[in-house]
Each structure stands twice: as C-alpha cells, then as structure tokens.
Amino acid sequence: MTLLDQPHAPVAGTPGPPGPGRAGVRRRVASTPLLLAATLAALTFAVRSIGLARSFELWIDEMHYADLGASISRGEMPALADGPFFLHPPGFFLVGGAVIRLLDLQTGDSMDLVYDLRWLTSALGALSVALAFLLVRRVAGTWPAVWAAAVLVFEPFVLRNNSRVFLETPAAVAVLAGLLLLVRHLEGGDRGRPRLRLFLAGLLLGLAVLTKDVFAFYAVAPVLLAVVWRRTLPFRDARTVLLGMVVPYAAYLVLLWVTGYLGAWATAKADGFLRLVGAEQTTGFNAPGAPSLVERLLDQALHYSTSYVLLLLCPLAGLVAAASRRPGRRLVGLTAVVMGSLGAFLALFGTLEEHFGYPVVVAGITALAVAGAEVLDRRPSLRKATVVVSSVLLAAVAFLGVSLVTEDDDGFLRFSAWAATELPADARVGVTNDTSVRALRDDDRFGPWSTAEQLQENGAQYVLTVSLPTEQGYARARPELLDWLEDNGTPLFRDEGPTNGETVLWFVDRDALAAAAARGVGGPPPPPLDAGTAGEPVPEAGDGGTP
C-alpha cells in the first residue's frame, strides 16, 4: 500500500443515501483517491490560471523573493541590493532558483520574473489542495475531504496567496505532506518501516520551517502538543519526527557558519522575532500610523468575508477535532488550535500582516471538515443540518473566489505596457510607493521622488501615484501630495483596482511644481527603509517584516 492509496474512513453511524445508483457512484469515487486528488489539483490550477496576471496586483515582496531565487540560480547566496538576505530561510528561494535554472527564465526584469514564477506558486497551490484532500480523507472520509478541497480551490484568501510569489504556499505544501505521513502512521493499517516514515514526516515539516520560520507553529508545536494531549503521539515517535525536523535547518545553519554569515543571520532573526511578538511595531496593523484592523476588515469584507468566518472558526473547529477518540483527527485539530491561537495573539499584540492569515485558513478548513465528521459520528441526526450549512458556506466561498479571479487588479502591469509606448524617452518620473520604485528601478526615467522638493531637484514633471496605499500611510508619498496633484496635475494614465485604488500618472507644470516645492508640499523626504537583510537601508527595500 502506498502513501496515497489510503482506505476510506467512513463516518460511523451515518446512513448512506438511498438508491443503489447513488451508492455505487459514492463507492466508485471513494475507491479512486489518486484520480480524485489529481482532478481537484487540476481544477485548482485552472482556477488560479484565470486571473494570475490580471487579478492580483504586483507586491514588492514578490519581486524580492523572485530576485532571491535568481541569485541562487546564479550559484550565489540569497541576496538583495544591500547584501545576503537572512530574514527568511532559503527553502522557497532554492525551489525558485532551480525552476529559473531549469526553464532558463530571464532574470533581468524583476517584474517579468514575478509573473513567470507565479505559475510555480499556482502549481504548488494545486498540490496543496490535493494533499489537503488526502489528509482529510484519511481521517474523516472521502466526502468531507472533497468539501475541504473544494473550499480550498475557491477560498479568496487562499487564492490571493497561491496566485502571488509568496512563501506561505510552498511552506503549506511541506506541512500538509508531513501531516499526511504522520496521520497515516497514527491511524495504523499500514505495514512498512514506521521509523523511516516518521523521520520523513519530520523532514517535510522541517522543510516548511526552512521556507518560513513562523511555520514552526504549524509544523512543530502540534507535534509537541500531541505528546501530552491524550497521548496522541507517543514520545518515542515524536522524538523521531523532531529529529527529522531539525535536519534541514541544521544544514542551513552549518552552511552559514562555514561561510561566516551566522552572526548576520542571528541579527536578522532577532529583529524579525521582536517584530513578530510586537516588541517592535514597524509593520502590520498594530504599527504606529497603520490603518485600523477593523476598518481594513470592513473594507475587504466584499472580497474576503468567508475568509474571516474561517479564521474565526479555525480554533473552534480545532477544539472539536482535538476531542476525537481518533489520534489522526486529534492531530489535525491541534494544528488548528495552534494556528488559530497564533492568529489571535498576532491580532491583539503582535505584528499581524495579511499573509499570516493563509496558514490559519488552511488549518481551519482541514480541521472544520474533520470536526464535521466528528460531530456526525456522535450526533448522526445532525447530518442534514451539517450538509446544508457546509453547502451554503461552499457556495459563498465559490462565489467570492470566482469574483476575485475575474476582477481586474493589474494597474502596474497596465502602466508598464502603456509607458513602453506612450511615455517620452526623456521623461523624468517620480514614483511614490515601494512597489513601483522596485518595479521600475532599472528604467532611468523613474526615481524614488515623492515630495515636491525631490521632484523639482530631479527635473521630474511626471508623478506616478497609488491612492489607496497613500491614504493608508503605506506609500512613500503623503496624502497632501495626492491632494495637490488632484488640484494642479493633469492625469495622463489612470487605472483603478482594489489593491492600489487609483494608479495615476500625473503631468505637472514646472512653475506650479517650483511653487509647491517652496511651500514644502509633500513634507520632508521619507527615510530609507531597512530591507531586513544585511542591515543596510536601501530606498527600494520592502521586506522588513517578520521571519
């Protein structure tokens, strides 16, 4: 028996639907897990391919991660403009570098490279859905697993992450694969070499941590809790898993020690940890001057309301699953309890950034499917109500997901295409947020000039602005510059999308700009940002967040 050929785990006490025809269909579907997993993965990839370029605006972190993969493809340490990069471990950068090398992708333009690598993260997202299906099927049965996978196919927050070059998607793939091996061991019924299986499970979980440190909460903490919670995982087994976990990161640390970078890594990790726990609030919703979390939730409710429901249900579903008699279900429940608790802590005290919601949603969906099966095991009379509620939630998720992937949100891509043919060769353009600075840095016409004084000093008569980040305090420009441009500038290009609001290229008269510079419109020049890599501030830096 292979890892994927796992027996169907029926929901005890739940009557099947009447009629031999439907029962036969159910049996045939349940007996072909590989085919069903592959079908769900193909559907996932197809849905993500719809809006991969046009429905998800460019983020600066994507360009950093793409460039880090490019540096590895050249045989270098992961590095940005200011030196080797240590804020995040190199797991995904190794994968990205291998793909760049294998497919001979061009790395000269970071923006183009991002859109190439989005196909990689979409493929990994499809793999994660297949793994989630197999995981839930192992402990809860085929139909709860199909429901969980279908929710993951369309869930807006999952789509948002799978469709961008973010670290969370590959990390989740490793976690789900490791949990699948662990659950297979806990549920029994398989012959073979259990020590090797446990070690491989730990190795996969360790690869998740090697991709993003914060995934230690998803990969390591549930294993530790499983030892003490109703003896879900025997200590001897946990020891083997933990041994496998430490191998990837230990190899990374040895490499840093040999190359002399261990001290720089420790500094970057210490800074990232202080940000994570809230001791230093420089990013996220709890940072000074950041928009209110409540306001942001209300603004995004049209797109992500089901995501918020799943975030709230995550720890509750985890508690239900963790109370099961079956150890595999308890382990899945513990992952949701840990991730839901982490999300609550970050929202209240730590550095909460939107992409942190992705692993919480994934853990919540898998636990919710398992919790539903657990409830039906104990209360079969609730079957009809469970089917109705789960169907309504799935329908709402699908509606929002389809709306998201069919919506236009590609202002920078459209501006880049427009500028290639319409912008004069001798134009001087001030760009006013970090993403545009990074995307356009190789074009001599553009520069990080976001005040009237900077624009005048550099002979710029064009200004590229993004309204929503500027109004929220996330751009290099201040809202007063945007107000001044509304009154004194001439818009030459305008695009509207949910991420940036209005992306506008303005033309300004030299005399009006000189008068504005004399009055100090836009305030003093913004300080450079710390890239969180080698500690040197660089103007185009962006990833100064948490590990």
Each model region followed by its residue ranges:
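Hydrophobic, aromatic-rich transmembrane alpha-helices
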Residues: 42, 227, 305-329, 336, ...
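Short acidic/glycine- and proline-prone juxtamembrane loop motifs at membrane-interface regions
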Residues: 59, 157-170, 353
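Membrane-lumen/periplasm interface segments of specific transmembrane helices
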Residues: 237-286, 307
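Catalytic lumenal/periplasmic loop and adjoining terminal transmembrane helix
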Residues: 391-503, 519-521
